[in-house]
A protein has these predicted regions:
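Electrostatic, structured charged patches in enzyme active sites and in nucleic-acid/phosphate-binding
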Residues: 1-115
């Protein structure tokens, strides 16, 4: 989950199941986008989906994914070292409640592997 107008290093790529140009901001997002493109149960996905109506600010969710069975799932990418920090916890909880309010219960975090 990032600010809508995030100013940082960005990688832009065309990927098979992504509806638009896939913009990734870190290695976790890049690796997960590649994984989604290879999975057979995924129909399509969108990166950096704007969370409209948040009073806390303008934020985007990392991945909104549509499966072949028509259900949706949401994934947020976060580094293991940052997941326990209060601001990141607050933002992840905002994302989870935002999507739960819209009927998407399959919400989760993508975390880098333990070293």
């Amino acid at each position: 989950m990032r600010k809508k107008n995030y100013k940082g290093r960005i990688t832009k790529r065309y990927l098979p199941k992504c509806n638009d140009i896939c913009r990734t901001y870190d290695p976790i997002m890049t690796a997960y986008a590649d994984l989604l493109s290879k999975r057979e149960d995924i129909d399509e996905y969108r990166c950096n989906v704007y969370l409209e109506g948040l009073t806390e600010g303008d934020y985007t969710t990392d991945f909104l994914i549509k499966k072949k069975d028509g259900t949706f799932m949401v994934r947020e990418c976060v580094y293991r070292s940052r997941i326990t920090k209060p601001i990141h916890y607050k933002l992840l909880e905002l994302s989870r409640s935002y999507w739960l309010h819209r009927g998407i219960v399959d919400w989760g975090c993508v975390i880098n592997e333990k070293k």
